[in-house]
Swiss-Prot record:
<comment type="function">
    <text>Member of a network of 50S ribosomal subunit biogenesis factors which assembles along the 30S-50S interface, preventing incorrect 23S rRNA structures from forming. Promotes peptidyl transferase center (PTC) maturation.</text>
</comment>
<keyword id="KW-0690">Ribosome biogenesis</keyword>
<dbReference type="GO" id="GO:0005829">
    <property type="term" value="C:cytosol"/>
</dbReference>
<feature type="compositionally biased region" description="Polar residues">
    <location>
        <begin position="1"/>
        <end position="10"/>
    </location>
</feature>
<dbReference type="GO" id="GO:1902626">
    <property type="term" value="P:assembly of large subunit precursor of preribosome"/>
</dbReference>
<protein>
    <recommendedName>
        <fullName>Dual-action ribosomal maturation protein DarP</fullName>
    </recommendedName>
</protein>
<dbReference type="Pfam" id="PF04751">
    <property type="entry name" value="DarP"/>
</dbReference>
<keyword id="KW-0963">Cytoplasm</keyword>
<dbReference type="InterPro" id="IPR006839">
    <property type="entry name" value="DarP"/>
</dbReference>
<keyword id="KW-0694">RNA-binding</keyword>
<dbReference type="InterPro" id="IPR023153">
    <property type="entry name" value="DarP_sf"/>
</dbReference>
<keyword id="KW-0699">rRNA-binding</keyword>
<feature type="region of interest" description="Disordered">
    <location>
        <begin position="1"/>
        <end position="22"/>
    </location>
</feature>
<dbReference type="GO" id="GO:0043022">
    <property type="term" value="F:ribosome binding"/>
</dbReference>
<dbReference type="GO" id="GO:0019843">
    <property type="term" value="F:rRNA binding"/>
</dbReference>
<comment type="similarity">
    <text>Belongs to the DarP family.</text>
</comment>
């Protein structure tokens, strides 16, 4: 009496061609993490991604769910639906949006640094006007004087905000 050996039924080429169980689990987990990133997006962004309707509905539903267990199950379901699509274009679109957001934030920080330098250092005004010759120097100096007056009088920072808005108009946003 011989005992069937299941290992003999599977050829070596079959074993090499299919991914390991661990590899499959890693890929499924990566899809679920991508799904979590998608759930965090605004609904308008989700619809921009041109995903299958069932996946879009599942993502929007996951945003609504607050129960931990139900949300976990929904995320697993989203991971399952993600297996049917090519995740590369979705990942690229998310990365592009994030990169765009980072550039916008860097631009805003640049504006804040200029505003702080202009307020604290009189020589910075000359440097700013040289860097951005389209600047209305009279308006800039007026706003800087008003910022100082408001600060001394403990008034709300109306001119402080107006100075920032002026800088937004003058300094171009960093483009892609």
């Amino acid at each position: 009496m011989t005992v069937p050996n299941h290992q003999q039924d599977i050829s070596d080429s079959d074993l090499e061609s299919r991914p390991s169980k661990t590899r499959l689990k890693q890929e499924m987990h990566a899809l679920q993490v991508l799904g979590e990133r998608l759930v965090e997006l605004e609904p308008a962004r989700i619809t921009e991604l041109d995903l299958p309707e069932k996946l879009t509905d599942a993502l929007l539903e996951a945003r609504r769910i607050t129960s931990h267990g139900a949300r976990r199950r929904q995320m697993q379901f989203i991971g399952k639906l993600m297996r049917a699509i090519d995740p590369v274009p979705v990942q690229e679109k998310l990365d592009a949006w994030q990169h765009s957001s980072l550039k916008h934030t860097a631009w805003l920080h640049q504006l804040e640094r200029w505003r702080d330098r202009l307020i604290s250092d009189e020589a910075a005004v000359t440097e700013f006007v040289q860097s951005y010759p389209q600047t209305d120097v009279r308006q800039l100096r007026t706003l800087l004087r008003n910022v100082e007056k408001e600060k001394l009088a403990n008034k709300p920072p109306k001119s402080f905000r107006a100075l920032f808005q002026l800088l937004r108009q003058i300094i171009p946003e960093i483009s892609a």
